[in-house]
């Protein structure tokens, strides 16, 4: 019967990496033909390129502001350093539109976006984009911080 074999374990090999987990639940970049598609190869297709470009440019044009919440009242936090980062200059070589276009492009093609926070005097001074393909989630190797909370850990390939 079909249903008797549906819920049985297919192999005894444990899933140990995020890539194996993605393959196990069907989130890999394999196509129905069995060939893998990279984000660079997908961008060579006119339909994919056009869709990603329209999304990225549309979101890139939108204003991005930071707000304080005082009770039930929202106020624009123009005096905050973080407001300047996300609305006027995220880093020394990108405009906010270019930065947000890159964010949306990475989200569409890779599913994630990472930025390195460059800190100066305890405050974030720049947001430097990091290639999502070069970042590995440190599964099970998170450290405990003095406050007792767990934080997600990432490392570069």
Swiss-Prot record:
Signal peptide: none
Top-level division of the source organism's lineage: Bacteria
Paired cysteines (S-S): none
InterPro entries attached to this UniProt entry: Phage/GTA_portal
Pfam families, A to Z: Phage_portal
Stated family: Belongs to the phage portal family.
UniProt miscellaneous comment: Encoded by the e14 prophage. Missing up to 260 C-terminal residues compared to orthologs.
Name of the featured protein: Protein BeeE
Phylogenetic lineage: Bacteria, Pseudomonadati, Pseudomonadota, Gammaproteobacteria, Enterobacterales
Gene that specifies this protein: beeE
